[in-house]
């Protein structure tokens, strides 16, 4: 993947403004609520019976934070995102058996949460760069499925 200097600047700028403890739980909760079939991977998280329970679930919040910190790996290795996520791809495909389509669903929820947080600063150019970054991460996470 080729990154322009503008894309690199935009992506790094987005991450420099993120409050992982706030945004991670919001994005992950949204995914579990909007796409309830994704809940099947998280039965050990306890009560996920409705939106209120999901949004108040400490395990959901912790996993959302973990997911956002997982994106730091891609940020640090933008020139080798596929290689950087090889181990996580294996974990999700071989041990956890996660449907790779769910990575795209979660990335969409992350984009929505970031857009809500950045407001007018989430310009079309910003969205394009962030979407490209997440699409490459999603592809890397799904690599072991191919």
Curated annotation (Swiss-Prot):
Binding site for heme b: 63, 92
Domain (Globin): residue spans on this chain: 2-146
GO cellular component terms given for this protein: blood microparticle; haptoglobin-hemoglobin complex; hemoglobin complex
Keywords from the named record: Heme, Iron, Metal-binding, Oxygen transport, Transport
Pfam families: Globin
GO function term, MF aspect, one: haptoglobin binding
Swiss-Prot/TrEMBL GO biological process terms: hydrogen peroxide catabolic process
Presence of the UniProt keyword Phosphoprotein in the record: no
Highest taxon, organism lineage: Eukaryota
SUPFAM superfamilies given in the database record: Globin-like
Tissue: Red blood cells.
Keyword Heme: yes
Bilayer-spanning residue ranges: none
InterPro entries: Globin, Globin-like_sf, Globin/Proto, Hemoglobin_b, Hemoglobin_oxygen_transport
Function of the molecule: Involved in oxygen transport from gills to the various peripheral tissues.
Oligomeric and partner information: Heterotetramer of two alpha chains and two beta chains.
Family to which the UniProt record says this protein belongs: Belongs to the globin family.
Protein's UniProt name: Hemoglobin subunit beta
Organism: Pogonophryne scotti (Saddleback plunderfish)
């Amino acid at each position: 993947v080729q990154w322009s200097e503008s894309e690199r600047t935009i992506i790094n700028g987005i991450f420099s403004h993120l409050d992982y403890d706030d945004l991670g739980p919001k994005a992950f909760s949204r995914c579990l609520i909007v796409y309830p079939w994704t809940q099947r991977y998280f039965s050990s998280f306890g009560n996920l019976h409705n939106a209120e329970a999901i949004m108040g679930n400490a395990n959901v919040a912790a996993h959302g934070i973990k997911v956002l910190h997982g994106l730091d790996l891609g940020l640090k290795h933008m020139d080798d995102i596929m290689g950087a996520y090889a181990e996580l791809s294996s974990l999700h495909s071989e041990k956890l058996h996660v449907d790779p389509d769910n990575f795209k669903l979660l990335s969409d929820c992350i984009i929505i949460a970031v857009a809500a947080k950045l407001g007018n600063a989430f310009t079309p150019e910003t969205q394009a760069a962030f979407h490209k970054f997440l699409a490459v991460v999603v592809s890397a996470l799904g690599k072991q499925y191919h």
